[in-house]
Amino acid sequence: MPRSQRNDNFIDKTFTVMADLILKVLPTSSQSKTAFAYYRDGMSAQADGEYAEALENYQAALELEEDPTDRSYILYNIGLIHASNGEHEKALEYYHQALELNPRMPQALNNIAVIYHYLGTQAEEQQRLEEAEQFFDRAADYWKRAIQLAPNNYIEAQNWLKTTGRSNIDVYF
């Protein structure tokens, strides 16, 4: 039984009913509607921490979805799951795939920066200082790109860029 049919949460159930109504009236293909249903079930499973189920739904959605922007969000969510599981290389792979389809996705740029910053911190703690600086520089590059797309977001990243001397712009917003 699809997750959307067994949801106990009133708000999620309401969202599902609304999404189903919208899907019925939208002039889109049956394949796109099925892809969205898988995507919606993937988001629901992900929100519940059911990552294996979410990944199955996202993979099914990817097989059906043809729209590049919609595919980018599916790939992004797969990246989120891998990042949550500490699988940084896999997460980076999916975030980059999402950006290939949708280069104006600041949240993917931010998450790539967060991973590179984390890897830099790990390298720094292990006294691999040159490697740490390379990771920090990569993080800075991705944060700058994210901030350019969403200047009012990522305030902590903006502060980090300034305090580490990696900012070439005084104020982003």
Curated annotation (Swiss-Prot):
Gene3D superfamilies: Tetratricopeptide repeat domain. The keyword Thylakoid applies. SMART domains: TPR. It is a peripheral membrane protein. Keywords: Membrane, Photosynthesis, Repeat, Thylakoid, TPR repeat. It is found in: Cellular thylakoid membrane. Essential for the assembly of the photosystem I (PSI) complex. May act as a chaperone-like factor to guide the assembly of the PSI subunits. This is Photosystem I assembly protein Ycf3. It comes from Thermosynechococcus vestitus (strain NIES-2133 / IAM M-273 / BP-1). The lineage of its organism: Bacteria, Bacillati, Cyanobacteriota, Cyanophyceae, Acaryochloridales. The gene is ycf3.
